[in-house]
């Protein structure tokens, strides 16, 4: 049986720079008011709450939310984690012990270009799997989230074939982002359908035909079709909504409220 839940990914606010770092009560209030049931902050957005999990629990209780996932983004450019990268991974794994049902999302920071592509892909996979092994040992479910900037080593279909053929699905899942898939020139429905058995976490954001970020429902991605597909595949997990449009960068709260309207009208009736 499918149990799909919808939450807010913090990148909508992260685009504003340092303005919203640590503003968990504010973002949670906006997310809850918009009709979302969870949040997904990246570690860099937690601010003082990263040292005080009890305080985060209080915020979640106040706004009737769950922390559906926490995202960790690092370079992972070498054949193994650097000491600093391993420290960051251990920190988030220790933090997640306080939130036993929360998913860990791993996302690689893009480089300046795609030089030495095969080696960089192999290095990234090695680092991701090293973290995933430790995560699995702790009972923490995790997935890898590819992105689409020009310097990403997992951004086009050929990259996805490499990634999803090599990743050990016993310890790490696939966290597809509909917007990044489209921006990488791929068929979003095809990717979700082909790899649906590997999917443990999902990101939604919309994009136009000219590959400009857009509000939910204002672009080309057929979100209702994806939700229906994942429901029928008995997906039990989160779909985190974010927006990277210029409008969202200026006013993430308003963008989230509008995306909540789309959620209530077009997606919630499907699950």
Regions found by a protein language model. Give the residues of each.
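Histidine-acidic metal/acid-base catalytic patches
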Residues: 1-35, 61, 90-94, 100-101, ...
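Structural motif corresponding to the early beta-alpha repeats
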Residues: 25, 37, 41-131, 136, ...
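Hydrophobic, aromatic-enriched interface-forming segments
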Residues: 138-156, 160
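Short helix-to-loop capping/linker segments positioned immediately adjacent to catalytic or ligand/cofactor-binding
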Residues: 132-133, 147, 190
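A cross-family glycoside hydrolase active-site/sugar-binding cleft signature
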Residues: 7-11, 40-42, 68-73, 105-108, ...
């Amino acid at each position: 049986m499918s149990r799909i839940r919808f939450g807010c990914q913090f990148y909508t606010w992260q685009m504003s720079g340092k303005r919203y770092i640590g503003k968990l009560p504010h973002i949670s209030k906006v997310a809850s008011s918009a009709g979302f049931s969870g949040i997904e902050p990246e570690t860099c957005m937690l601010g003082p709450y990263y040292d005080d999990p009890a305080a985060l629990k209080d915020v979640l209780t106040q706004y009737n939310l769950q922390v559906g996932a926490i995202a960790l983004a690092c370079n992972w450019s070498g054949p193994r984690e650097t000491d600093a990268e391993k420290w960051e991974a251990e920190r988030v794994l220790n933090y997640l012990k306080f939130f036993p049902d929360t998913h860990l999302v791993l996302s690689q920071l893009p480089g300046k270009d795609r030089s030495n592509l095969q080696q960089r892909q192999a290095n990234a996979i090695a680092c991701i799997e090293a973290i995933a092994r430790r995560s699995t040992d702790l009972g923490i479910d995790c997935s890898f989230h590819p992105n689409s900037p020009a310097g990403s080593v997992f951004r086009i279909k050929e990259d996805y074939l490499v990634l999803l053929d090599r990743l050990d699905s016993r310890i790490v899942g696939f966290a597809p982002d509909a917007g990044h898939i489209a921006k990488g020139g791929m068929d979003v429905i095809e990717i979700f359908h082909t790899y649906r058995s590997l999917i443990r976490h999902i990101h939604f954001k919309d994009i136009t035909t000219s590959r400009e970020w857009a509000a939910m429902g204002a672009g080309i991605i057929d979100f209702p079709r994806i939700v229906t597909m994942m429901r029928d595949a008995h997906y039990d997990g989160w779909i985190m909504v974010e927006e990277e449009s210029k409008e969202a960068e200026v006013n993430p709260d308003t963008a989230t409220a509008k995306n909540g309207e789309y959620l209530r009208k077009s997606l919630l009736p499907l699950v």
